[in-house]
Structures are given as structure tokens and as C-alpha cells.
Amino acid sequence: MTEQDAAIVVKPGTVSLDDLARVLAGQPVVLDPSFWPRVEAAAAIVAKAAQADTPVYGINTGFGKLASKRIPPDQTALLQRNLIVSHCCGVGPATPEPIVRLMMALKIISLGRGASGVRREVIEQLQGMLARRVCPLVPQQGSVGASGDLAPLAHMTAVMIGEGQAIVDGKTVSGGEALAAAGLAPLTLGPKEGLALINGTQFSTAYAISGVLRGFHLARAALVTGALSVDAAMASTAPFRPEIQALRGHAGQIAAAATLTALLDGSDIRLSHLEGDERVQDPYCLRCQPQVAGAALDLITQTARALIVEANAVTDNPLVLVETGEIVSGGNFHAEPVAFAADTIALALSEIGAISERRIATLVDPALNFGLPPFLTPDPGVNSGFMIAEVTAAALYAENKQRAAACSIDSTPTSANQEDHVSMAAHAARRLADMADNLAAILGIELLVAAQGITLRAPHATSAPLVAVIAALREQVPALGADRYMAGDLAKAAALVEADALPAAAIGVLPSDPFPRLA
């Protein structure tokens, strides 16, 4: 199989979230050949401008506050190289390889639109690095999301020209060594090419896309753990009736309620308390699941739409208008749409965890759990059961609540006030990874607690889909009897939630991918 055969062939302007999810899973990308003529036409316009007397930002001028400084033609290559190494100012831990690879793929898509003015060789260098698994070492911190993700993209570009550092087979090597080992030669940047590579939102967008995909997955998993909690608490399914959802009309709410109903259909536990149950209404954490989970699903779908647009966008500056031959300065590098999207995803992640934590608290409380023992241990007192697991869920929710504060409103001026309003998209998107980790752990705890509650409801059993979920859990974690070391149980349950390892019996009734595609 050739590199071309293994790669996703991308057509900028029509790339889907499915395509990008495959990149996160490890597939490389190559540009559809039909886009090369436009790429080459834009590069020719830039080459002509580099030899002219008229100042054009970033081609024959300095950058940022130094835009008034003219650069002679014989120094344009040096200008681009110096731009890259001077902007390699990232700090902090290395960005995970899947995010770096997605960032590189997004840059290929953006450059492939033929409005950046780079030569074909630039895109081919990125394609070669992806195909041969040359992963630039990109520190996570240092971008404010305007003028693009300068520092992270500079670290990516440094490896393209044989400088900086890369990770190959888990080892950190110089950029030059990484290219040589992959059979690639260092690239010499032409006019505007360094600027086109580091000016853009691809770092922030890569993190945000990963966040929206994980958010949708965890929102679906929360419907499974939430359904388990309904039966563990012997709660009512009447609030999930379709007539109630239709009277409000939100698509996510309707889908969430239908999913909960399907997951609980046929439950003997539910049938056992249809008569003689004196409770009138359940707590909100059980009763209002469609409203909360549905709102989260709707938010995730809306942000996905914005991120699909951004993934297909040209976000550097200046831009080449091939039809007119002009090179025009603009502001597409400003990552406000990404920052808003990331802030929105953070809200959804936080609220899914908030209501899950309340369900956990309900199930361990003998005043609320309708006849179950305190902390769901068969012998309370000498055993503490799930007492501290609930505390852990509360701690994780508190962390996510703090992280959910909007980053996009926290602008600060940079570059001698030339770049006087910034998006903070990089920070907004980066925190989603930690928030998703916390949410997976919270849902894992709910999975353990709700499964324990259902086990204690014997001889009554839950529905067939939920029996299958509990069986999958029990392959990893036995029901809790006497107290035991719990950290391993929590880790296994979180991994089950995160890995999409829930049984087909449950997955078959979950909401399907709602994400729009660009035609």
C-alpha cells in the first residue's frame, strides 16, 4: 500500500468531522490533485509581489509592529526563516501527537484552498511528515489565538525546515534528524510561506474538534449511566414521555428522552413499582435528564457546525485573491469563532458532569435512594462502600465548574498594542481535554454506583440493554461486597465509558451522529 492509498484525500471546503476523526485516529491526509492549479496560481502571484517595489505585508515587510520595515528581495528567505525560529516560544508539556497531526492536516486543508500563496512543495512537506509519522514537538502553551496560533504553528514549521524538535517512535530528536530518518529533505521557505504556515487557527481548532468529538461521545454515555440511575433509584419514566418533549420542541431533548425510554423499556424494576409507589415526583437529576442532556447535545451539535466551517477555512494573512491577482490584508487569523465554540463545549461538559454527580449523590443517600443501604454497601458501618467515590465525583465536578468559565472574554493586548484584542482560543480549547477526562471519571463512578444499586434490587432486574451494560462492567469490576481498594475500579469504569466499549444492545438506541456536513 502506498502513502497515497493509506491517506484521506481531502477537498478543502468539504472536509467533514468524520474525516477529521480519522486523522485523530492516525490516518494521514493528501490534497485532492484538482486543487494544485489554484495553489500554484496563488504562489505565482506572491512570487511576483516579492520582486515588486510595492510593500506587501509579510512578503517584503516585517511583521506585526514591524510591518513598516521594508525587506529587500535578497533577504526574503532569511525573513521567513527568522520568523519561524523567533516565534518558537512555546512552553509547557508537549501537545499529544493526535492533536499535532490534526493541526498539520488542518493546515494542509487551509493551504490547499489556494489563497495563501505557498508553493506546492510546502503542502507536500506536511503530507510527507504525516505519512511518515514525523510529529513536531509542540509545547502546549504560548498562543493567545490571534494573530493565529503563532507559537504552536512555529514549532510545527521549524521541523519542516530541519530545525526545532520532533518526536519519532516516542523519542525526542532534532527536526533535521527526524526528516532525515523519514527520507525527507528540509524545506527552504519562499516569500510569505513562513507567515502562511504560522498564521492560522489550526492549533486551537484541532483541540476544539477533539473536544467536540469527545463531548458527543460522553453525552451519549451519560444517557446510559443516567438510565441505569433511574432504575437504581426506582424512579419514574413518565417524565420521558414523547408528548412532554414535543411540547417544548428542542431536538436534543426529544432525542435524549427517546433514548432513555428505549434503554429502560422492559425493565422489571420499573414494572415492580408502578403500583403503590407514593412518591409524586423524582429529583431533578433523574426527572430532568432530557432537558439537561438534550441541551448539551444541541450545544455540541451547534459548535460542531462552527468547527466544520473553521476546519475548512483559510485563516492566515494576508490572503491571495487569485481571481483578481490581489494580496489583501485581513483578520481571518482571529480565532473568536473557535474560542466561542470551545467555551460552549466546556459548558456542556460541565453540566453533564454536574447532573451526573447529583445522581450519584442521590443513590448513595438512604434518605433519597428508596430503600437501598447507605453508600450502597450490604454491611454499612464496618464498610464505607461508595462514600468516597461520591466525594471524588464532587471534586471532579468542582474542577470542571471552575474550568467552564469563559476564556473568550479574557482578552489582553499583545505585540506593542498592534494585536490589541485576542481570542484566547488556544486556552479555551486546550482545557477541554482535562474536562473530558474528568467527565469520563464522573460517569465511570455513576456507572459503578448505579450498577451496584440495580444489583441490590434483586430479584427484580433492569431492561435487557442495561443488563448487557452491567454484564460488560462486571467483566472488569465485580459488584462491591466488603470494602476493597477502589482506585482500580474507578479507573476501569472510566476506561469503559471512554473507550465506547458499552454493549451493542445499549449503543443501538443511542442518538446517532447529528453533525452536519458541508456540501
From Swiss-Prot:
In its UniProt record, a GO molecular function of this protein is: histidine ammonia-lyase activity
Modification type 2,3-didehydroalanine (Ser): residues = S147
> How does it get modified after it is made?
Contains an active site 4-methylidene-imidazol-5-one (MIO), which is formed autocatalytically by cyclization and dehydration of residues Ala-Ser-Gly.
Keyword entries, A-Z? Cytoplasm, Histidine metabolism, Lyase
Chief location: cytoplasm
Please give a single GO biological process term from the UniProt record.
L-histidine catabolic process
Q: At what sequence positions does the UniProt record place the cross-link 5-imidazolinone (Ala-Gly)?
A: A146-G148
Q: SUPFAM superfamilies this protein is in?
A: L-aspartase-like (SSF48557)
- The EC number(s) attached to this protein equal 4.3.1.3
> To which protein family does this belong?
Belongs to the PAL/histidase family.
Looking up PANTHER family in the UniProt record yields: HISTIDINE AMMONIA-LYASE (PTHR10362)
User: Which protein is depicted?
Assistant: Histidine ammonia-lyase
In its UniProt entry, the species of origin is given as: Bradyrhizobium diazoefficiens (strain JCM 10833 / BCRC 13528 / IAM 13628 / NBRC 14792 / USDA 110)
